[in-house]
Amino acid sequence: IYEGYNHRKEFVTCEQMEHTDQFQDEVYQAARKLCVDNGYKTVLDIGCGSAYKLIKYFRDKKIVGLDLEPNLSFIRDKYPLYDFRESDFSKPPNENFDLVICSDVVEHVLDPDELMNFINEINFKHLVLSTPDRDVIQMLQRSFGWDVNDNGPPHNLMHVREWSFKELEQYVSSFFDIEAHFMTPVQKECQMMIAKSKNI
């Protein structure tokens, strides 16, 4: 992100207990296709939120969901047959995973490098990552008549920062090999990446 951008300095817990598939559904659809096309059997969802989409699309796979309280207690109670764990990015899971999903998480964390390094410590085959595109978000907000500060912090109080399309590509490519980067067709502000580890 460009010099002079104002990042939010405090983390606000993102409670998603009641969310189903109104956001990021296309991300999980694309992740499901990637999983099927490659015969993948194991899926890790970092910041799985309500876990609705994880279970909707991957109930036939071995799945692990990572999140924080209070989301964690909610999804453990709601889906007791699945494996949900608490994670603050300090220690990656020991298992290998075919697919890692990190959907609309990176904009919420104070130190995105910590998240990227956490993912890099996981042995995986493909990563699906998504986050809002700042330029599109700001265009939509202006169309609603909202006050928008081009230099941040984001209008959404739960977002620490937001990347433009080009900025995200530059940032993530320093950690992973990007295979595809595109905007989802229905949720217009969502940019999505498919990537692989540089360690493979």
Where are these regions (language model features)?
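Conserved N-terminal segment of class I S-adenosyl-L-methionine
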Residues: 1-95, 103, 113-118, 143-200
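Conserved acidic residues
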Residues: 41, 98, 125
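Residues lining the SAM
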Residues: 103-106, 130
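Di-metal (Zn2+ and/or Mg2+/Mn2+) metal-binding site signature of metallo-dependent hydrolases
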Residues: 108-112
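Residues embedded in well-ordered beta-strands
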Residues: 126-128, 192-193
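Conserved class I S-adenosyl-L-methionine
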Residues: 128-152
